[in-house]
Structure formats: C-alpha cells, structure tokens
C-alpha cells in the first residue's frame, strides 16, 4: 500500500515539474520532511499529519537500513581481502620455518666436517709419510747391521711398531679435537742395548775357588 502511494506521488510530481529544491547542507531528516511536504501538499485531504509522520519515519528507517547494509557489505569485503592477504603470509612463514630447520642441521654437519678436515686430514697424511720414512730407515739399518748380532734389529722393530700403533690409536680415539693428539715429532728414548750393559766385575780366581767339603 505504501509503495502504491509513493508511486502515485512520484507520478504526480513528474506530471507537475517545478524548480528543484535546494537541499545542500541540510540533514537527512529535514530533506525527508521537505520531500513529503512537496508530494503531500497537492492532496491535503488524503494525507493527514499522522500519515505524514509515519511516511517520514519509514523513509528514514529505510535509508538507515540501506546505509547499514552497505556498511556491512563493505566490512565483509574488507575482511575477505584481509584474510586473503593473511593466508599467504602465514604459508610463507611456515615454508620459511620448514627450510630453516634442515639448514641448521646441515650447518652443524658442515661444521663437524670442517673440523675433521682441519685436524684429522693433515695428520692422516703425515702418518703414512712417517711410516715410510721409518721403514726406509729400518731397512738401511738392517743392511748396515747384517754383520752385527740381531739385537739391534730387534730393538729397531720394538721401537717402530709401538710408536706407529700409538699414533693410529690416538686418531681413532679422539677424532674431533687436535689438543688430544701427541705431537708427531716427539722422539721416545731408545732402550739401552745389551752391549752397553756393564759386565759384572769379579776376581779372576773366582772360577778356581774350591768349596769346602763337610
């Protein structure tokens, strides 16, 4: 019914063109009242004051509802756009965190490998060279001492093998710390040869002594 009345009023207004109402700077309530007066003035017997007030309130409520709906739509659009922006950011953060975890592990492995390369590899390269030198010196000693007793050769072997095994044992026992290694240049004291042991001193007549018979 109200819509029918409003359509009739609009048709009447279009049929009677007048000068436009200057409503710049006026509030919404004043504009609604002016519009109602403009439409209702030609039909005072149809619309009373109560009808005019009801129509004005209805128009005001409809305008406020329209504004509220527009505001809600704008808020929903903003929330959707903000959620779309937040989701890629969270996905990128998760991807970065997943990449950081293995990178830390690989860094730890690389540090360990660098330590092993720094401390172990030079010593592992030195040990075979030292062994070759000692073998060469041992062979020369064997050729030089062919006419001498085998005591000197046995002493050379007794000095060579414990020293070589001791160095390899140290490398296996402490793989990641250079301060545990005994310097390779250290020389252990040679064992005294049997020829250097002083002979016991005794009297020449010790072999001719006679034991008394009881």
UniProtKB/Swiss-Prot annotation:
The keyword Phosphoprotein applies. PROSITE patterns: CASEIN_ALPHA_BETA. Keywords: Milk protein, Phosphoprotein, Repeat, Secreted, Signal. The modification Phosphoserine is found at residues 63, 79, 81-83, 90. Sequence repeats lie at residues 85-99, 125-140. The keyword NAD does not apply. It comes from the Eukaryota. InterPro entries: Alpha-s1_casein, Casein, Casein_CS. Residues 1-15 form the signal peptide. Its main location: secreted. It is found in: Secreted. Disulfide bonds: none annotated. GO terms for biological process: response to 11-deoxycorticosterone; response to dehydroepiandrosterone; response to estradiol; response to progesterone. GO terms for cellular component: extracellular space. Mammary gland specific. Secreted in milk. Coiled coil: none annotated. Belongs to the alpha-casein family. Important role in the capacity of milk to transport calcium phosphate. This is Alpha-S1-casein. It comes from Bubalus bubalis (Domestic water buffalo).
